[in-house]
């Protein structure tokens, strides 16, 4: 085979791994976290001390954001991309504001596989 064909196959394998590793949760390529048994797959220095292999990052997390006080804000903000958020959005109190707010999304894991959340 030519070097280009081998290179193209390697790129396809990396893309395939990137797409299908998003729903693995805590289960890495070596199966469930088995401590030292998944050692070479977890990265250098992690397997032999009891940390198993790591799966792809599914974008799940837990956090709270609270803002209180006066917020004199002038300008515009634009947020684009994927922000996996599960929770509620609340705005209360008097505010002299002009503009529009659009909040849309879907509850649950973004990949729909129901993996375990990271704490």
Swiss-Prot record:
InterPro entries: Chorion. GO terms for molecular function: structural constituent of egg chorion. Residues 1-21 form the signal peptide. One of its GO terms (cellular component) is egg chorion. Residues 56-103 are annotated as: Central domain. The keyword Repeat applies. Keywords: Repeat, Signal. The lineage of its organism: Eukaryota, Metazoa, Ecdysozoa, Arthropoda, Hexapoda. One of its GO terms (biological process) is chorion-containing eggshell formation. This protein is one of many from the eggshell of the silk moth. Belongs to the chorion protein family. The keyword ATP-binding does not apply. Residues 104-119 are annotated as: Right arm. This is Chorion class CA protein ERA.3. Residues 22-55 are annotated as: Left arm. It holds the Pfam family Chorion_1.
């Amino acid at each position: 085979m030519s070097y280009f064909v081998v290179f193209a196959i390697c790129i396809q394998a990396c893309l395939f791994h990137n797409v299908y590793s998003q729903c693995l949760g805590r289960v890495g390529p070596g199966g469930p976290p088995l401590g030292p048994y998944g050692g070479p797959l977890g990265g250098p220095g992690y397997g032999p001390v009891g940390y198993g292999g790591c799966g792809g990052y599914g974008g799940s997390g837990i956090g709270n954001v609270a803002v209180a006080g006066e917020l004199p804000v002038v300008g515009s903000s634009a947020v684009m991309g994927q922000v996996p958020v599960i929770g509620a959005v609340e705005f209360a109190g008097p505010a002299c504001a002009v503009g529009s707010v659009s909040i849309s999304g879907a509850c649950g894991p973004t990949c729909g596989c129901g993996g375990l959340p990271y704490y």
